[in-house]
Amino acid sequence: MKRIVFIFSLMLIISCESPVNNGVSQENQAKFEQQIESFRTFTDGFNKEDLELTMSVIADDIQWSPPVYNGGETIGYDGFVEALEGYFETFEDIQFIEGEGPNLGPALNADANTAFWSGSLYSSATPTDDPSGLRVYGVWKWKHSESGAEGGNKWYGLINFNEEGKIYGFSDYMDYHGMQVQIENYLKSSQN
């Protein structure tokens, strides 16, 4: 009889265990996925060299921190458009490859898309589960229109979204000078 009471008590305790909460609400997950789609619209516009499509996900009050160091100054809407037009004029076949590179996360499977991250469990600022700040990793591939040189840049972006789901804060990091080096190396190799 003691065994039956013990087994019954043990089953009762185990069945009352709280479900594990991974800290991600369905609302925040949906918001995160929508922001990924907005970023994909942005990169699709780049690929098609369609300024209207690219800018369709950009807020009028965008503050952009370009990959070239400029003393920490942010650039507004008109400067952002001007930079995009410069890319479209200078390059063709522009495409973004999400998360290209090794998957270094110990808990992730080899096929996981590690391009997009949001929220912060550990932070020097206040930890948050709010997905309004998106971190994106990948590679931009391109072909230089004038020389025909093909190249690519590893890229990291910090993107903030407003309540309408548009990008209002954008900092991107890449070896901007490396683009010129790749073009120059192509020109040198084609002269030999």
Where do the protein language model's features map onto the residues?
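C-terminal motif of bacterial Sec signal peptides marking the signal peptidase cleavage site
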Residues: 12-15
